[in-house]
């Protein structure tokens, strides 16, 4: 991962700009391939088997969508950014992969793609009132989505997020155990590889969204603050 990060950092940013749409198209083809030859696992069809490893195209699309939107707005006059006709292409670029990801189904990644795209549109200069209209439309559509679009497990995730205690041994198990791990880390943590929640299988999926709880248990509040500081440095450096 670190080697790949360094290689990407060494590539001239103009190369990413030139090939942004090509990368997006490749990611889109991979998402379509999931529909045709995708591997099913844990009740979802999200991966493509490449022999040596399985690739999750939605992860590639997270990067490809950012590049494509950045490329589009790079060539858009600033005074034209907020006009409706200049929003058609970005909306299509966003909604097509989101729809494909929702079919897998992968609600979390779909929401992340939407959130990332929204941030880019804001930074590009799209007026806030347009987002207010969009947000109002989404709120109005929530009952319809809940009734007709969301799968049972997706509804469980939403309800569990709002109240993990409703099913502490089922859907809420990971959240409950992650809270225990966060609290047990204390100020300085239990030490590297010494976390009981993470290494005694109380958090069986600790390598996924719950990786932060593993860090908190082993390195405590100080370790968490150190991680936050690194993120802040990256953001500050990006704006500098």
Residue ranges with predicted function:
Residues 95-108, 182-197, 201:
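Membrane-helix interface and discontinuous TM-entry motifs in multi-pass inner-membrane proteins
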Residues 186-222:
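Long extracytoplasmic/lumenal interhelical loops at the membrane interface
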Residues 1-174, 213-240:
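Hydrophobic alpha-helical transmembrane segments of multi-pass inner membrane proteins, especially
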């Amino acid at each position: 991962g670190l080697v790949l990060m360094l290689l990407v950092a060494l590539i001239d940013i103009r190369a990413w700009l030139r090939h942004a749409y090509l990368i997006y198209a490749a990611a889109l083809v991979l998402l379509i391939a999931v529909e045709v030859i995708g591997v099913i696992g844990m009740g979802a069809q999200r991966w493509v088997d490449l022999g040596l490893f399985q690739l999750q195209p939605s992860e590639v699309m997270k990067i490809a969508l950012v590049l494509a939107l950045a490329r589009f707005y790079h060539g858009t006059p600033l005074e034209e950014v907020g006009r409706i006709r200049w929003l058609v292409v970005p909306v299509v670029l966003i909604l097509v992969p989101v729809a494909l990801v929702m079919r897998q189904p992968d609600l979390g990644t779909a929401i992340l793609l939407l959130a990332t795209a929204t941030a880019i549109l804001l930074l590009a200069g799209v007026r806030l009132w347009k987002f207010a209209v969009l947000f109002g439309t989404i709120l109005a559509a929530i009952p319809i989505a809940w009734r007709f679009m969301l799968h049972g497990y997706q509804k469980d995730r939403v309800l569990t997020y709002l109240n993990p205690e409703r099913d502490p041994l089922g859907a809420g198990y990971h959240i409950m155990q992650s809270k225990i791990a966060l609290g047990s880390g204390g100020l300085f943590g239990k030490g590297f590889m010494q976390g009981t929640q993470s290494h005694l299988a109380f958090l069986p999926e600790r390598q996924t969204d719950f990786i932060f709880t593993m860090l908190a248990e082993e390195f405590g509040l100080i370790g968490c603050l150190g991680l936050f500081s690194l993120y802040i440095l990256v953001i500050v450096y990006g704006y500098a």
